[in-house]
Amino acid sequence: MDRVPFCCLLFVGLLNPLLSFPVTDTGEMSLQLPVLEENALRALEELERTALLQTLRQTVGTEAEGSLGQADPSAETPTPRGSLRKALTGQDSNTVLSRLLARTRKQRKQHGTAPECFWKYCI
């Protein structure tokens, strides 16, 4: 019988923090997104069209040359947000990735011809 009041007190004690949070009626509040003006929307659409047309021209141009490997790897392509980025193709993206990974690795010193090494400790 002693366990029933103890369990009730424990339950109320654990439930109390949950009841202390305010509950707001989410039906009254609506999600309000920022409204862009029509001019801003038109400019964004025009920029996206320009970027798509330029990438299409580059793609068609590289196919006309014969292979995708002959494309200029440092060609700048506009993004829909208006910034320019360098287009990397094939092997160039692998070299960039390997350079980034090489920076994070620790360079270990060579201890001459000492063959007696355990993990990173050499005698």
From Swiss-Prot:
GO biological process, one term: positive regulation of fibroblast proliferation
Main location: secreted
Record region (Disordered): 63-91
Tissue specificity comment: Brain specific.
Keyword entries, A-Z: Cleavage on pair of basic residues, Disulfide bond, Hormone, Secreted, Signal
Subcellular location field: Secreted
PROSITE patterns, A to Z: UROTENSIN_II (PS00984)
Keyword Cell division found: no
Endpoints of the signal sequence: 1-20
Propeptide feature ranges: 21-104
GO molecular function: hormone activity
Domain of life of the organism encoding this protein: Eukaryota
Keyword Disulfide bond (UniProt): yes
Pfam families reported for this sequence: Urotensin_II
GO (cellular component) term, any one: extracellular space
Residue pairs linked by disulfide bridges in the UniProt entry: 117-122
Stated family: Belongs to the urotensin-2 family.
Known role: Highly potent vasoconstrictor.
Protein name per Swiss-Prot or TrEMBL: Urotensin-2
